[in-house]
């Protein structure tokens, strides 16, 4: 599975955890709503377990892809250097490893921040859902199960909108993971090529993407 697919699985697990707790008790009653607020700690523990299960795997897959792209970028310069009969100085591979390691750590940090944001977002969504379900049931607009079914349907369509960018656009976790991975792979390929050119003493050369 790709990093984005693993994050999607994580999002699904978190939503499933919320649904499981919402379905417990006399749905929509005042006591039920109070119970849901009291279950935030339980939800947090369940979601932390889901994150521990899938986020580490997602980080590993993202780091693999990033390293692969970096080495592909370096290989393009190596091929050019062979044509020009240039030799790679000693220690160049170690420097490349350091560069790729830096990008790998940066990616892990981004994904870990994403996991923390998902936890906070799940808490807010759960509380909001319990309030909405309670209000609908008390008003007689829907039964408890109807209100939950509508809530779940909305989550299925929209996902867990946990991230907002500078333009105010909202992103699901898997979409955000794709953005992180795409951006980092583009950067690591470029920086790996620059690093290799520096090692060979090459000026900027035109490279097809």
Over which residues does each language-model region extend?
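Acidic, glycine-rich two-metal-ion catalytic cores of nucleic acid-processing enzymes
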Residues: 154-157, 161-209
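N-terminal leader/targeting and assembly helices and adjacent pre-domain segments
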Residues: 1-167
């Amino acid at each position: 599975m790709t990093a984005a697919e693993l994050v999607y699985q994580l999002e699904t697990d978190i939503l499933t955890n919320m649904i499981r707790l919402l379905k417990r008790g006399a749905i929509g009653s005042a006591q039920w709503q109070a119970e849901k607020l009291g279950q935030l700690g339980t939800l947090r523990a369940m979601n932390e377990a889901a994150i521990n299960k899938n986020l580490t795997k997602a980080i590993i897959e993202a780091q693999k892809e990033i390293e692969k792209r970096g080495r592909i970028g370096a290989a393009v310069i190596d091929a050019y250097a062979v044509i020009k009969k240039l030799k790679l100085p000693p220690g160049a591979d170690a420097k490349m490893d350091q560069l790729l390691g830096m990008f790998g750590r940066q990616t892990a940090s981004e994904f870990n921040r994403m996991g923390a944001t998902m936890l906070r977002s799940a808490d807010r969504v759960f509380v909001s859902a319990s309030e909405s379900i309670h209000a609908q049931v008390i008003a007689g607009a829907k039964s408890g199960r109807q209100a939950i079914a509508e809530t779940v349907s909305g989550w299925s369509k929209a996902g867990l909108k946990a991230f907002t960018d500078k333009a105010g656009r909202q992103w699901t976790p898997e979409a955000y993971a794709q953005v992180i991975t795409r951006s980092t792979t583009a950067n690591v390929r470029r920086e790996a090529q620059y690093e290799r050119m520096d090692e060979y003493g090459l000026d900027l050369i035109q490279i097809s993407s």
